[in-house]
Amino acid sequence: MRLDKLLTELGTGSRSEVKKYIRSGLVTVNGEVVKKPEQKVDEKNDTVCFRGNQLTYTEYEYYLFHKPAGCVTATEDNLHRTVMDYLTDTARHDFFPVGRLDIDTEGLLLITNDGALAHDLLSPAKHVSKVYYAKIDGRVTEEDVNLFENGVDIGEEKPTKPALLEVLHSGDNSEIRLTITEGRFHQIGRAHV
C-alpha cells in the first residue's frame, strides 16, 4: 500500500495534508525518514511512525453503538444528527452502520468498515436474527403471538417471514421482545399488534 494512502486511512489527515507531513520528514518507516508519499509499505509488517508515534493498521474495525432516539441511521444527513456524528475517536471515513433503526428508535447497532460481514448479517438468505424490545400501547394477546408466528401483513405484496413475539408484560401499555430474520422498511412499526 502507498504510504500516503495508509496514513490517510489511519486518520492522520487528508491525502494532501499527509503528503505535506511526509515531505516534511515527519514520517518514518522502520526507523528511516521517508519523504516520498508514493513509497510502498507493508501495512502489516513495517513499523510506521508519525511524529514519533507508532501507527497501527487494522483492516477492519467494529464498534457497538447504542443509538439514541432522534438521530438517523445513516452516514450523512443534512437535517438530522447521524450515528456517525457520535464517532469522535476515529477519523476514518469508510465506516457505515449495519442495518437501520428508525429515527425515534433507540438500540444497539454495529458500525464497521467490513462490507463482507455487513452483507452476511443483512442478507435474508443467511437468516440472522434481529431482536427488538418495544413498549407499545394496548394489550398483547396470545392471538398476536400466533399472528407473528405465521407472518404479518404490513401492507406489502407478501406478509413478513414468521417471527417470535414474546410478551414480557401485557396491559394498557405492553412490553414485548420481537425476533425477526428479515428487515423490511419500518417493519416493526408497521406491524400493528
Task: Place the predicted regions along the sequence by residue.
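Basic, flexible Lys/Arg- and Gly-enriched helix-loop patches that mediate nucleic-acid binding at interfaces
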Residues: 1-192
